[in-house]
């Protein structure tokens, strides 16, 4: 052995050791999942009819998102936020009424369905989704797109007057296209389901 050590080979006989580092238990992780629902309402109505048009599938989509979180043993539902929007069609005052009350109708539906505490769900509303409207026009190939966008960006115009001028500028056919292809998508309810993922323990 001394002879080997003198030749620099003694290290071969040293026992190798592997150090095992114990991981720290992870802290709680905060997560969120988002979605959008496009509920249908009869004209000027604020009550949700679950069987009306596509409401069955849209409500199921919301429930599926919530259920995914609720049914996972590693997660805890901490809150739900709902943000409702109306389209610019009609007066701003009426659209404010619709956006506010339709948002509340969805809050009431979710609260009632799951028997949630009222404090679990928060909500807000936007009277008219002009941001979505502008994105639609900007991405379109409408003949008077630039003029319509200029009108949209004019902050000096009364909101109702602006909508009327856009309708006049677009013309009957183009405005009909906007009513059918754009406005329905601007009536939406965005929802965020917040939850925590518990940290693992060392046995896991």
Features from the language model and the residues they span:
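Single conserved hydrophobic/aromatic residue that forms the stacking wall/gate
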Residues: 2-13
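Periplasmic peptidoglycan-binding/anchoring modules of Gram-negative envelope and division proteins
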Residues: 19-32, 41, 46-83, 87-88, ...
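Extracellular/periplasmic catalytic domains that process cell-envelope and extracellular macromolecules
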Residues: 31-34, 74-75, 181-187
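Soluble periplasmic/extracytoplasmic beta-strand elements of cell-envelope proteins
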Residues: 38-42, 79-83, 122, 188-194
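Mobile acidic interaction elements
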Residues: 59, 71-73, 107-108, 180-181, ...
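Periplasmic OmpA-like peptidoglycan-binding domain that tethers envelope proteins to the cell wall
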Residues: 87-191
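Extended amphipathic alpha-helical interaction segments
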Residues: 198-200
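Amphipathic alpha-helical repeat scaffolds of TPR domains
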Residues: 203-204
